[in-house]
């Protein structure tokens, strides 16, 4: 009668082939978007959209008259957050 560890080892052997599949799933063509005959990387568009959304957020915070400490860190973090969310949502 197999023990719990041997059952886990057998199950791991059955599913071990999945690990290399996930490791090479990123080895595809670079996502590029053609704009007027030139190809631009998709991260460029995520950065532009993130910059626009960060500026809108800044304007909303200014109009609400909210005072923030560490403004540079906060807006940099918002820029990075928005860029990653755009990348996750659209690419």
From Swiss-Prot:
Subcellular location: Cell membrane; Membrane
Annotated lipid attachment (S-diacylglycerol cysteine): 27
Signal peptide: 1-26
Membrane topology type: Lipid-anchor; Multi-pass membrane protein
Tagged with keyword Cell membrane: yes
Main subcellular location: membrane
GO CC annotation: plasma membrane
Transmembrane domains' residue ranges: 33-53, 70-90
UniProt keywords, alphabetically: Cell membrane, Lipoprotein, Membrane, Palmitate, Signal, Transmembrane, Transmembrane helix
Positions of N-palmitoyl cysteine lipidation: 27
Family membership: Belongs to the YtcA family.
Protein name per UniProt: Uncharacterized protein YtcA
Organism: Escherichia coli O157:H7
Lineage, top ranks: Bacteria, Pseudomonadati, Pseudomonadota, Gammaproteobacteria, Enterobacterales
